[in-house]
Amino acid sequence: MKLRPLHDRVIVKRVENETKTASGIVIPDSAAEKPDQGEVLAVGPGKKNDKGDLSPMAVKIGDRVLFGKYSGQTVKVDGDELLVMKEEDLFAVVEK
């Protein structure tokens, strides 16, 4: 199944955090927090402004983004857990 987001929504796949600290301590799965960053898999066409024109999206497919721990709606697609959220729920794009 393939998802195509509508309006100003994006589909994001969480990127797992490191399970080992810089000092070498391994963090067990039970103590690990949900990752707060992910990769954009799909982008909607944008949000319409007051004049009816589409405002372009600030993110694109492949961008690594930061978001709140409880942002978006979780959906399962082909065994993968994905997030559907509005573009305004994203905090930043991680530059490499």
Curated annotation (Swiss-Prot):
InterPro entries documented for this protein? Chaperonin_GroES (IPR020818), Chaperonin_GroES_sf (IPR037124), Chaprnonin_Cpn10_CS (IPR018369), GroES-like_sf (IPR011032)
Query: Which gene is annotated as encoding this protein in its UniProt record?
Result: groES
Output the GO biological process annotations, alphabetical, semicolon-separated: chaperone cofactor-dependent protein refolding
- Binding partners and assembly: Heptamer of 7 subunits arranged in a ring. Interacts with the chaperonin GroEL.
One Gene Ontology term of the molecular function aspect: metal ion binding
Q: Which family does it belong to?
A: Belongs to the GroES chaperonin family.
**SUPFAM superfamilies given for it?**
GroES-like
* Compartment(s) of residence: Cytoplasm
Q: Which organism is it from?
A: Polaromonas sp. (strain JS666 / ATCC BAA-500)
Question: What's the name of the protein?
Answer: Co-chaperonin GroES
* UniProt entry keywords in alphabetical sequence: Chaperone, Cytoplasm
Establish whether keyword Heme is in the entry: no
GO CC, alphabetical: cytoplasm
- Short name of any one Pfam family annotated for the protein: Cpn10
Q: What does this protein do?
A: Together with the chaperonin GroEL, plays an essential role in assisting protein folding. The GroEL-GroES system forms a nano-cage that allows encapsulation of the non-native substrate proteins and provides a physical environment optimized to promote and accelerate protein folding. GroES binds to the apical surface of the GroEL ring, thereby capping the opening of the GroEL channel.
